[in-house]
Amino acid sequence: VYPRGNGEDYKQIPNSKKEWEIAAYPLLLASLRTALGPSKRISAAVPGLPRDFRAFTPITIPEIMSSVDFLNIMTYDLMNRRDNVTKHHTGIQNSLEAIDAYLDRGVPPEKMNLGFAFYVKWFKTDADADCKTHPIGCKTALMEDPATGHDLGKAGAFSWHDEVPAELAASFDRALADGTYDSKGGGHYFFDVEEDLFWSWDTPDALTKKFPAIVEKKRLGGVFAWGLGEDAPRFEHLRAANGRVRRLVEEGKKNDGEARSEL
């Protein structure tokens, strides 16, 4: 749930009734800082979709940053059931859009951590859409009830340590075998023509591409992942990320002289 709305209950409690949270959120963080003192490290996980930045404005950002040490930018779930066309859920380009949006609002780059997703997402596409020819930007099935906001079961996610749902197992096998990397959007994906399913996830190789393209380019302070246990039992994504973090440390390219990765 994000400050100032767009949460699970946004159809029942409209954003207009949560306007008060815009001013309350910095006050909450300030109270935490006062209670914990200046020596404790405070971070906040914040949305990666600009449409959810309702409480993060050029006015509130300075107040927020005066109380926290850094922000964990959730650059994943950038496609969800409220979307109506396919896109990468944790791609390079939409991650850059999130980082740039926070930079434009006044967040120092060294105070931002880029988020990695240690899980897979899938979405049902419209059977009448030409997703085979245009898998990115293709029309999805209706994934959310327009009246209630409830999940219609046309999208989902699971972790690497999870058992793949039986009804998705064959499609996911095809995704693993034939998935491809979109060099334009910067994301790994697969479109299953047999079941009209769009798959979006990071391979270890796709994940490491984000270091030069985002972390180094924007001179960010670090990285984090959601979540550690979700990469079990092989921890391939964790090893890939840790390898790049160590490389940055060894090359002296981090900004603030202190490793702050949460991996």
Predicted regions, residues:
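Active-site and adjacent substrate-binding regions of carbohydrate-active enzymes
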Residues: 1-48, 72, 194-257
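Substrate-binding surface in catalytic domains of secreted glycosidases
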Residues: 2-165
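Glycan-binding loop/region signatures in secreted carbohydrate-active enzymes
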Residues: 116-213, 239-262
